[in-house]
Amino acid sequence: MEREEIVSFLDEYLSISSYPDKSSNGLQVEGKEEVERIAFAVDACLDTIAKARAFNADMLIVHHGIIWGGVSYVKGLFAKRLKALLSSEMNLYVAHIPLDVHPEVGNNVQLLKLLNLEPLEPFGEYKGIKIGYIGEFEEPKPLPMIAQILAEKLPVDYVRSYEFGLQEIKRVAVVSGAGGFAIEEASEKADLLITGEISHADYRTAEDLRVSVIAAGHYATETLGVKALMKLVREKFGVKTIFIDSPTGL
């Protein structure tokens, strides 16, 4: 399969150029023209690159790439990561915000699906766009039950539940990864915010606004879109794929 055919499909399907994002979405590193084996991971780090090489991957598709806000110098850790990719002629394709917001394979839609919810409306204002969604249960569910479902379905050792608001939850807002910025909006539009992680300051914001938050793991909540995209690419192009798990515990 030609690289450009895969890249063109991903660029269009994920609307790569439609979002303001410093993470240089799309093909970050150009490698082999022919692609038969594709590795998928959350992060492009030395661990996942090495495991992709062991799989003999022609392309690595990730949520977090190696370029953030442009390149000034090619040295240090950046040089090591780049060398690891170039030495094996491995393509690196990145979908950061585009994979958060996508209405079919996106992290946030997939997070709602774990709770058997459908996206009702966009949520989570970030640089002028909504990157998350709101879903709604037909009948209210106990907050501990929701936390337990996520703990069972996500690749995470535990979830943190900050029970500052309602115990019976009907409207759920989701923002994968670091979604603390959406706490204020959640206090106005939902009974619960589900995200990956929050900061110390975010904790106090949620406490003062009396809104409950579940932090289910930054890494764990962002495996969902990558895995959904992997399934789509495998079925569409008939390539061999692998998901490389490299958890951070965060």
Curated annotation (Swiss-Prot):
Annotated GO CC locations = cytoplasm
**Xref: Pfam families:** DUF34_NIF3
InterPro entries from the UniProt entry: DUF34/NIF3 (IPR002678), DUF34/NIF3_sf (IPR036069)
Q: Where does a divalent metal cation 2 bind?
A: H64, H218, E222
**Gene3D superfamilies annotated for this entry?**
NIF3 (NGG1p interacting factor 3)-like
State the family it belongs to.
Belongs to the GTP cyclohydrolase I type 2/NIF3 family.
Protein name listed in UniProt: GTP cyclohydrolase 1 type 2 homolog
Annotated organism of origin: Pyrococcus abyssi (strain GE5 / Orsay)
